Amino acid sequence: MTKGPIRLDVAVSYALPRAGLPSAVSFRKWVAAALKGRIREADLAVRLVDEKEGCSLNHHYRGKDYATNVLSFPAELPEGLPKGIKMPLLGDLVICAPVVAREAAEQGKSLAAHYAHLTVHGTLHLLGWDHDDDKEADAMEQLEREILADLGIDDPYAGEQ
């Protein structure tokens, strides 16, 4: 676990009208919470998209013909870098705004809390966390709960068991 301040650059882009969407400041806060104690320096991008772009990306990268809530694209270090060189580039998150809004309404969650959860979830994927099996899923979900609790956000998995 690392201590001390995080040097963090979060570039947020909106591929749809910004009305009703979280601010870049909010995304930075949520990413910082996910990284706290885990990494000291990071650059990443968050892109908010419509369903058409979300579906296209999900099809291209995962072979799924629907838009999903969040996609994580970890950065890959360029070949040929000298050993020991560390690059702060963590990767990209793509968040499909209409899917997030629909899920929040269906699940009775505040929109901000759902965006926070998905941003934390996606950021953990960039750090290498996954949920391919029950054990991994349980560990990742517990970490998400802890991070969100630190942000004052209720357990996103409450009532799912």
UniProtKB/Swiss-Prot annotation:
<keyword id="KW-0540">Nuclease</keyword>
<keyword id="KW-0479">Metal-binding</keyword>
<keyword id="KW-0690">Ribosome biogenesis</keyword>
<protein>
    <recommendedName>
        <fullName>Endoribonuclease YbeY</fullName>
        <ecNumber>3.1.-.-</ecNumber>
    </recommendedName>
</protein>
<dbReference type="GO" id="GO:0005737">
    <property type="term" value="C:cytoplasm"/>
</dbReference>
<feature type="binding site">
    <location>
        <position position="131"/>
    </location>
    <ligand>
        <name>Zn(2+)</name>
    </ligand>
</feature>
<keyword id="KW-0255">Endonuclease</keyword>
<comment type="function">
    <text>Single strand-specific metallo-endoribonuclease involved in late-stage 70S ribosome quality control and in maturation of the 3' terminus of the 16S rRNA.</text>
</comment>
<dbReference type="Pfam" id="PF02130">
    <property type="entry name" value="YbeY"/>
</dbReference>
<dbReference type="GO" id="GO:0008270">
    <property type="term" value="F:zinc ion binding"/>
</dbReference>
<keyword id="KW-0698">rRNA processing</keyword>
<dbReference type="InterPro" id="IPR002036">
    <property type="entry name" value="YbeY"/>
</dbReference>
<feature type="binding site">
    <location>
        <position position="125"/>
    </location>
    <ligand>
        <name>Zn(2+)</name>
    </ligand>
</feature>
<keyword id="KW-0378">Hydrolase</keyword>
<comment type="similarity">
    <text>Belongs to the endoribonuclease YbeY family.</text>
</comment>
<dbReference type="GO" id="GO:0004222">
    <property type="term" value="F:metalloendopeptidase activity"/>
</dbReference>
<dbReference type="GO" id="GO:0006364">
    <property type="term" value="P:rRNA processing"/>
</dbReference>
<feature type="binding site">
    <location>
        <position position="121"/>
    </location>
    <ligand>
        <name>Zn(2+)</name>
    </ligand>
</feature>
<keyword id="KW-0963">Cytoplasm</keyword>
<dbReference type="InterPro" id="IPR020549">
    <property type="entry name" value="YbeY_CS"/>
</dbReference>
<dbReference type="InterPro" id="IPR023091">
    <property type="entry name" value="MetalPrtase_cat_dom_sf_prd"/>
</dbReference>
<keyword id="KW-0862">Zinc</keyword>
<dbReference type="GO" id="GO:0004521">
    <property type="term" value="F:RNA endonuclease activity"/>
</dbReference>
